[in-house]
Amino acid sequence: MSFGIDDLPVRDELRGKSPYGAPQLDVPVRLNTNENPYPLPEPLVERIAERVREAARHLNRYPDRDAVELRTELATYLTNTGKHPVGIENVWAANGSNEVIQQLLQTFGGPGRTAIGFEPSYSMHALIARGTGTAWISGPRGEDFTIDLAAARQAIAESRPDVVFITTPNNPTGTAVPPETVLALYEAAQAVKPSMVVVDEAYIEFSHGDSLLPLLEGRPHLVVSRTMSKAFGAAGLRLGYLAAHPAVVDAVQLVRLPYHLSAITQATALAALEHTDTLLGYVEQLKAERDRLVAELRAIGYDVTESDANFVQFGRFADAHEVWQQILDRGVLVRDNGVPGWLRVSAGTPEENDAFLDAVRELKKEQNA
């Protein structure tokens, strides 16, 4: 007699759902998870080893519960790059931006509360909402994947959400949200109740525009979420962080697990922050490759969404999954992200991008034959 998940007393809202995950396939070129394709530079690897070696001497003790040194350095990074002064009291860090989002929803969402996001957008927002017992509301986007301000305001007024998610640059479309739109949505949310507005800036270092950190001034219900997985090329580190009013930082600590950031994680992140200039140099290379992908895909004849991230959404396809498979058959893995008619490709190294472009050129020739 077989026994499966349906035989367990799983919460009703989790039944029939699937866990988050992109395919992990062994192919020559993997451009499906928006990772930074460049390995960490050797001087940084050596510095990580030094810091981890020092931390290892004290692993018999719990790590710094409040990650004071790390939060101080993150605040310095945000101040230097975000055109807005940020102090340690404004910063909180966790195991990836997903844990940051989880802690925010545990604090401000939960049973009997709601969260709204404007989809298609980062699917983990909805998944984490369900995991925390927060009812999820799918807000509208326009045909061009931008946020229709009038429709979004109406959705907020009707649903009265406790948490509002705005992802900019947006994943999976790559589109940025103008500051004036974010401000308008913040004001719309505050007009109905004291809602928390979370701006997810996971890809902001790749944007043509600036961070929205300056909007934090005078807006205690606004949160900016970040990650070290993308621009810092440290997806394996799992380090996310937020900037917000000090009261928000105090609030999320009500739900954090004790000593949630390991000494090894803190040591590694601190080493990476010492090499910010080098790592952001790779970001400039990836931005150039992203722009090249946009131009080349349009020249080949595909529709391409404007991108402010390290990936490009392209289409349109009658059967996107079939095209995904045809690209995979040519040794290149891209992402079928569930947006009907569209696929997403991460910006890789020039050689990886050439392999991808060769594959889609070949496909286009076959389609036109």
UniProtKB/Swiss-Prot annotation:
The keyword Transferase applies. One of its GO terms (biological process) is L-histidine biosynthetic process. Pathway: Amino-acid biosynthesis; L-histidine biosynthesis; L-histidine from 5-phospho-alpha-D-ribose 1-diphosphate: step 7/9. Homodimer. Its cofactor is pyridoxal 5'-phosphate. Residues 1-39 are annotated as: Disordered. The modification N6-(pyridoxal phosphate)lysine is found at residue 230. HAMAP family: HisC_aminotrans_2. Belongs to the class-II pyridoxal-phosphate-dependent aminotransferase family. Histidinol-phosphate aminotransferase subfamily. The keyword Membrane does not apply. Its EC number is 2.6.1.9. Keywords: Amino-acid biosynthesis, Aminotransferase, Histidine biosynthesis, Pyridoxal phosphate, Transferase. This is Histidinol-phosphate aminotransferase. PANTHER family: HISTIDINOL-PHOSPHATE AMINOTRANSFERASE, HISTIDINOL-PHOSPHATE AMINOTRANSFERASE-RELATED. CDD domains: AAT_like (cd00609). One of its GO terms (molecular function) is histidinol-phosphate transaminase activity. It catalyses: L-histidinol phosphate + 2-oxoglutarate = 3-(imidazol-4-yl)-2-oxopropyl phosphate + L-glutamate.
